Each structure stands twice: as structure tokens, then as C-alpha cells.
């Protein structure tokens, strides 16, 4: 077969295969173009999740007839300066989107440039039959895409159900809307309005906060820490959830580089490391985090869809993001999710409704069964018992009254002075009930004390080494490859401080001679393999943090107050005071709350007061 040049239309269809995977890809490319055009309002209309029709309308700068003709040709763009290719500030720059979409659909573009009298229209079918005509339109651009993938039926067969494709498009619009709070967005599907975000024109922080409420919800903002972190060439802002407000998946994690939504493994690892001490491995925080970096320090031209980026110094970026998130979380370290109390109150309400007695079964307070007989009670004379009176007379009344008054005063001060209030009771020898000025607090004594122990051993490890236990028979661990063995050996000094002593044994094996004493009868093979995997996948930060977490969790669990142990009032109050002075005491080591606060006004509502 001889080598030959491909036709322009074939080239565009190949490019479309890289850039346009589904209707959501079309919406992404065209909405980003509208953003680059300086739009303040962008409307999206879909039919059958975009398979039949996609319309994107904006009030941006618009195009002339000549610009319309050029715009649908490959590698034409108004956004890229050839002399400064690395300094990219716009979303689009490759000049591939419009011709690629046109090659696999029926496209109609109508546009009127700002300051011009006439509007123009260009029509393309499968990338051909380009016709520019005069039209009528407001300033801005409207692009209609019909019968997507009609020219590539094989790609059409790979599309998912309308519901699945629509979910993907909604996700795309939400991400772009988050990055541009000043722009109004609307999304309509089959004549049903799905999204409507009004543009916000206040200060940057207020705009961002309001748009996050629009997209993710008010509950997230109420349970999130604000991030504001800056270096000379780097800034991070946004919101990230407190540990007790988490999800079972990472769907609600929105990460942006220079306002570009990205799915970047390095950033996801940094997020995981930042929450390492506070969340179980199968739980995920919610976040909307925006990283602003000098465009010359990040390469966005890694993938045609521009979903991936490459950093000039990835470790620097990762460490900054970890530090920024941890700093933000420190400011909310004693807070638990606001939804926990409301969920608990809802359970109470449901229980009250389900257990409400019917009218026919209701019993009058004053009614008595027919066979009721009052129990015989001891007879008391109106004059006091002489022996009792003598005993009472001998008691130091003044001292008793003073002590009672002092105790009442101390408790009243505790209600006002301490966030977790004064302990009042212990429920089922597991939960501490305390009272503040306007609420009651229920504390899980085991989870709370476990967290206190966890933080204590973490502080200890900053300056001290763990006690090591020498294995009677050194364990030889064979690893999958030489790289895993080398990475473990390179970190042997750090591992030694954590109580793990190892030596190289051949190309792919490690000999373990000592383990942290606190771990006891641990599976050494699994421990080393897990460490090697984490070093390989995520780097030393998260791998060593995994080991620290394993050690500290074991220590904290072994030495914490168990559920079922009876505590005195002084012990309960001492635990509450320690919690108030310990970072991140609001959640256990797995992200579950250590206490729940029920406001008095909410309790009163339960009783209809």
C-alpha cells in the first residue's frame, strides 16, 4: 500500500476522535470558547442529551464573516501568540475544536461582532458545504450542532444512555460555572431547565462562595474550611470540607489549574495526604480548590482534551497544596459536620411519628384499671420523726448549702465557658452527656479518647523514635520488582525512625529485622508490600504517612478508654477539656464525629414548643 496524504475532512474526523468523545465534549469545547470570547451570559440547550441537538448561545465579542470562514478551518485561533507558546492564559488554543466538531455533525454558526451592524451565518454538513450568508442576531455567537456523529456511525454506537450522557454534560457545565462565578449559565434539556446560575459581581471571595453554594450546595459551605494560601509564584484558594463531612466517592472534588478543571493524579494524591490523619481510606472529602500558577510553570498541552497537566516542579506543587489544606483544616479542627445534628433530630422525629399511639389506644393520665388498688404506704405523722430530726439537726447546714451553691456556680460557668459544656451524665457507659448554655452535647468516649491518643503519639513521633521489637527470625520479603526494593531501601533511615529496620537482600528482596513494638503480631509481608506499593504509586510522603497512621491508630486504639467503662464526673469533664484543647478532636481517626451537638431550640421544636 502506497503512502498518501489524507484529505482535510479525514484529518478532522481523526482529530475529532481525540477531542470529541461524547456530547459533553462538544459542550465543553464550545462553552470554553464562549468564556474566552468574554461572555457574561452563556445558555446551553440540549435534545436527547445532545445526541440530536446542542445549542450554545453567548453574548461574547462575536465574529465577522471573514473570521467565521477562518474559524472552522484547522489550526486557526485568536488565542495563541506564536512568540510566547508557553504563556497560555485561555482555554482553547489548539484550533481543533470547531473543525473537528463540524466534521462529525451538521453545524450552524450565527454571529455578530460587537460594534458591527451585520450578523453572519455559516453552515457546514460533515465539515463540507461551507456557506456564509448575512443573518440577524444580537451581539455574540450562537452555535447549533445537530445529529452528532452522523458522519461516524461507529462512534455513535459507543454512546451511553441519554441519562448517562446528560449527567456527563451537567458535570462539565458545573465545573466551568464554578471557575467563572461572574458569568451567568443556564442548561435546558428537552424543554426542562436543569441548571440556572446567576452571575455574581462582588469581591472575588464572595463571588466564589456564592457560586459554590449554587453548584455544590449550602451544606458544603457550612461544613467547609476556606483556603487562602499564597507564595510569590503560586496561590491557592477555595473551600474544602471538614473531615466529618465526607462522601463515599470523589465525585464532588473539583480541582482547577488557572481556572481550568483538571483530573490530575498528583493533585488527588496531595488531597489524600492532607486528609490522611482524618479520614478512612474509603471516604473522600468534598472540595472546590483553585490553583493559580505562572503559565510558564505548567504545561496544559499534554492531552488534546486538556484534562491533564504537567508541572515544572510537581513535588513543590504537591507539598504546597498539602500545606494549604492542612492550614485551612487547622482553623476548623474542633468542628463537626452541621448535618450530623439535623440527621439525628430527623431520626428522633421519625421515631416519634412511628411510635405515636392511636387515639383508641390513648390512656388518660387520671384513668385507672378497674382492678386498681393503691399500694399500702407507711403512715407518716404530721410531726417529724424524732430520730431523723436529731440527725438533721447535727448536719452543718451552712457548709452543705455553700458547697451546693459553689457546685451549681461552677457548672453554670462551665456551660458558658467551655465549648463542650459540663458533663451531666454517662449513657450506657459509652456516651457522655454534657450541657452548654444553649445545647446538649453527646460525646463518644472511646472515639474521643482514641483521637486524643492519636494526636499525642503523632507529636511524640516528631521528636522521638518508636521502640523496636527484634524479630526472632528475620523476615525475607520478595517484592515484584527491583524498583520497589530500591525505593524501600532508599527510605530506610525514615523507616528506622518509625520502628522498622530493613536491609537489602538481592535485587528484589528486603530483610526485615525489627518492627515497631506497638504493632505486636503484625503481618510483616503485607506491611512491606503495602509500603512498597504506596511508595511506587504515591511517593514517600503518603507511604510513610500510611505507616505512621498504622502505628498511631494501633497505639491510640489500644490505650484509649473503652466503651463500657464507667467514668466519674471529674473524668468526663477532664476528657471534654482535653478535647477542647486538642486539634481535630471533632472527629475520630476515620472521619466519624466524636461528638454531636443538639441545639436547645431544635429540641424544643421536637416537642412542638
UniProtKB/Swiss-Prot annotation:
HAMAP family: DNA_mis_repair. SUPFAM superfamilies: ATPase domain of HSP90 chaperone/DNA topoisomerase II/histidine kinase, DNA mismatch repair protein MutL, Ribosomal protein S5 domain 2-like. The keyword ATP-binding does not apply. GO terms for biological process: mismatch repair. Belongs to the DNA mismatch repair MutL/HexB family. The gene is mutL. Residues 364-386 are annotated as: Disordered. It holds the Pfam family MutL_C. Keywords: DNA damage, DNA repair. One of its GO terms (molecular function) is ATP-dependent DNA damage sensor activity. GO terms for cellular component: mismatch repair complex. This is DNA mismatch repair protein MutL. This protein is involved in the repair of mismatches in DNA. It is required for dam-dependent methyl-directed DNA mismatch repair. May act as a 'molecular matchmaker', a protein that promotes the formation of a stable complex between two or more DNA-binding proteins in an ATP-dependent manner without itself being part of a final effector complex. PROSITE patterns: DNA_MISMATCH_REPAIR_1 (PS00058). InterPro entries: DNA_mismatch_repair_CS, DNA_mismatch_repair_MutL, DNA_mismatch_S5_2-like, HATPase_C_sf, MutL/Mlh/PMS, MutL/Mlh/Pms-like, MutL_C, MutL_C_dimsub.
Amino acid at each position: 500500500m502506497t503512502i498518501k496524504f489524507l484529505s482535510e475532512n479525514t484529518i478532522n474526523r481523526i482529530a475529532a476522535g481525540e477531542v470529541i468523545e461524547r456530547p459533553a465534549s462538544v459542550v465543553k469545547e464550545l462553552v470554553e470558547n464562549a468564556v474566552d470570547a468574554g461572555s457574561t451570559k452563556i445558555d446551553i440547550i440540549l435534545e436527547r442529551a445532545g445526541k440530536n441537538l446542542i445549542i450554545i448561545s453567548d453574548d461574547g465579542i462575536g465574529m465577522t464573516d471573514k473570521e467565521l470562514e477562518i474559524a472552522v478551518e484547522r489550526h486557526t485561533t485568536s488565542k495563541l501568540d506564536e512568540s510566547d507558546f508557553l504563556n497560555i492564559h485561555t482555554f482553547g488554543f489548539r484550533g481543533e475544536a470547531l473543525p473537528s466538531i463540524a466534521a462529525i455533525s451538521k453545524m450552524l454558526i450565527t454571529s455578530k461582532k460587537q460594534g458591527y451592524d451585520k450578523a453572519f451565518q455559516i453552515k457546514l454538513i460533515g465539515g463540507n458545504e461551507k456557506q456564509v450568508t448575512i443573518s440577524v442576531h444580537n451581539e455574540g455567537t450562537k452555535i447549533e450542532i445537530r445529529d452528532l456523529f452522523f458522519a461516524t456511525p461507529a462512534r455513535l454506537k459507543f454512546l451511553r444512555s441519554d441519562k448517562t450522557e446528560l449527567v456527563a454534560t451537567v458535570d462539565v457545565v458545573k465545573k466551568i460555572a464554578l471557575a467563572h462565578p461572574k458569568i451567568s449559565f443556564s442548561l435546558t434539556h428537552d424543554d426542562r431547565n436543569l441548571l440556572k446560575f446567576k452571575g455574581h459581581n462582588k469581591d472575588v471571595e464572595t463571588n466564589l462562595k456564592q457560586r459554590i453554594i449554587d453548584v455544590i450546595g449550602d451544606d458544603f459551605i457550612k461544613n467547609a474550611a476556606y483556603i487562602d494560601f499564597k507564595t510569590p509564584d503560586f496561590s491557592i484558594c477555595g473551600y474544602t470540607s471538614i473531615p466529618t463531612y465526607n462522601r463515599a466517592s470523589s465525585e464532588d472534588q473539583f480541582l482547577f489549574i488557572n481556572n481550568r478543571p483538571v483530573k490530575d493524579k498528583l493533585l488527588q494524591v496531595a488531597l489524600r495526604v492532607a486528609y490522611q490523619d482524618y479520614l478512612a481510606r474509603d471516604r473522600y472529602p468534598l472540595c472546590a480548590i483553585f490553583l493559580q500558577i505562572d503559565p510558564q510553570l505548567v504545561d496544559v498541552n499534554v492531552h488534546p482534551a486538556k484534562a491533564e497537566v504537567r508541572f515544572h516542579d510537581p513535588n513543590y506543587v504537591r507539598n504546597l497544596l498539602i500545606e494549604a489544606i492542612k492550614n485551612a483544616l487547622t482553623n476548623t479542627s474542633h468542628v463537626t459536620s452541621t448535618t450530623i445534628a439535623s440527621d439525628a433530630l430527623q431520626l428522633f422525629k421519625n421515631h416519634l411519628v412511628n411510635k405515636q399511639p392511636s387515639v383508641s389506644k390513648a390512656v388518660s393520665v387520671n384513668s385507672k384499671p378497674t382492678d386498681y388498688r393503691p399500694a399500702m404506704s407507711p403512715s407518716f405523722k404530721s410531726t417529724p420523726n424524732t430520730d431523723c430530726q436529731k440527725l438533721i439537726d447535727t448536719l452543718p447546714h451552712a457548709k452543705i448549702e455553700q458547697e451546693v451553691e459553689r457546685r451549681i456556680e461552677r457548672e453554670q460557668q462551665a456551660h458558658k465557658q467551655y465549648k463542650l459544656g459540663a458533663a451531666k451524665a454517662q449513657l450506657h457507659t459509652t456516651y457522655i452527656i454534657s450541657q452548654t448554655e444553649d445545647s446538649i452535647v453527646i460525646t463518644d468516649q472511646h472515639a474521643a479518647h482514641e483521637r486524643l491518643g492519636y494526636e499525642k503519639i503523632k507529636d511524640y513521633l516528631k521528636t522521638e523514635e518508636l521502640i523496636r521489637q527484634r524479630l526472632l527470625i528475620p523476615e525475607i520479603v520478595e517484592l515484584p520488582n527491583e524498583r520497589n526494593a530500591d525505593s524501600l531501601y532508599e527510605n530506610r533511615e525514615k523507616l528506622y525512625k518509625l520502628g522498622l529496620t530493613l536491609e537489602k537482600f538481592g535485587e528484589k528482596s528486603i530483610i526485615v529485622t525489627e518492627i515497631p513494638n506497638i504493632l505486636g503480631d503484625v503481618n510483616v509481608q503485607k506491611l512491606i508490600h503495602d509500603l512498597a506499593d504506596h511508595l511506587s504509586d504515591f511517593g514517600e510522603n503518603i507511604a510513610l504517612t500510611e505507616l505512621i497512621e498504622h502505628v498511631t491508630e494501633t497505639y491510640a486504639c489500644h490505650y484509649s478508654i473503652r466503651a463500657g467503662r464507667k467514668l466519674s464526673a471529674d473524668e468526663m469533664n477532664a476528657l471534654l477539656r482535653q478535647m477542647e484543647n486538642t486539634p481535630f478532636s471533632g472527629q475520630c481517626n476515620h472521619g466519624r464525629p466524636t461528638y454531636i451537638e443538639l441545639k436547645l431550640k431544635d429540641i424544643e421544636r421536637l416537642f412542638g414548643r
